[in-house]
Design a protein with these regions (language model features):
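Metal-cofactor-dependent catalytic cores
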Residues: 1-70
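Short coil/turn connectors at secondary-structure junctions
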Residues: 12-14, 71-74, 131-133, 178, ...
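Single conserved hydrophobic/aromatic residue that forms the stacking wall/gate
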Residues: 212-222
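Short beta-strand segments
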Residues: 77-78, 138-139, 197-199
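N-terminal small/polar loop signature for handling phosphorylated ligands or for N-terminal nucleophile
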Residues: 101, 107-138, 143-157
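Glycine-rich phosphate/diphosphate-binding loop of Rossmann-like nucleotide-binding domains
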Residues: 69-115
Length: 222
């Protein structure tokens, strides 16, 4: 658990890459039923197979050297009640993925959530603490509607504020439209993960994403 996510291990010919540390236990988890306590949240370590083969009990595991200059890792969360119910196509999320990929990021996860603070906070914590991604971009839920809870949920899980990015985005938006001042998006840090709220409009996403995926900014959160 002291090793970072993306650490790689060899067991004979098999190569594994750590993908997540800790995982929420389900109420009916078999381990919990058998032992009365689940180890998943505090001891669970998960990996994906990079090179397959056969392993046996007692095989020695070797920690492999880290990659040289690995890509930064990102996750994208779309907040939309209608989108989460399949009633509206998510156009902003795929656009963000496209822009991140073009900028050299490895997008580990994408998801669509309803505008629910509890669900958003849980995913932000999991992605930052368990998956240890460098960057989480949210899109949607930054306006004045009572259901727009993205900034509040983001601040609730933050360790530190990083206001300059959100301020730069609002400044840039104001140069295009006076409505730019209506965005309540925030930018914060949880551990080593940067979390940035983007508006839900694909047009605004395209205009604003360039600010924080530029080289000077992105290299600051390695």
């Amino acid at each position: 658990r002291n090793l970072p996510v993306t650490s790689r291990f060899a067991i004979g010919d098999v190569v594994l890459e750590m993908t997540q540390i800790g995982k929420e236990c389900h109420n009916d988890c078999v381990i919990k039923q058998q032992t009365g306590e689940c180890i998943m949240p505090h001891e669970g370590v998960f990996a994906r197979v990079l090179h397959g083969g056969t392993i046996h009990v007692g095989d020695e595991m070797t920690l492999l050297p880290p990659e040289e200059d690995p890509p930064l890792r990102a996750a994208v969360i779309t907040l939309s009640d209608k989108g989460s119910r399949g009633e509206r196509e998510d156009k902003s999320g795929p656009l963000i993925v496209e822009m991140l990929t073009a900028a050299g990021y490895k997008v580990e996860e994408t998801m669509i959530l309803p505008d629910e603070a509890k669900a958003l906070k849980a995913q932000l914590i999991r992605l930052a603490d368990g998956r240890q991604v460098n960057l989480i971009l949210t899109t949607g839920g930054t306006g004045f509607s009572p259901r727009d809870i993205t900034p509040e949920a983001t601040c609730a899980v933050a360790d530190r504020n990083a206001p300059g990015i959100a301020e730069a985005m609002r400044y840039h938006s104001l140069s295009i439209t006076p409505r730019g001042m209506l965005s309540r998006g925030v930018s914060v840090l949880r551990g080593k993960t940067l979390i940035v709220n983007l508006p839900g409009s694909p047009k605004a996403v395209q205009e604003l994403s360039l600010i924080h995926i530029s080289e000077p900014t992105r290299r600051s959160y390695i």
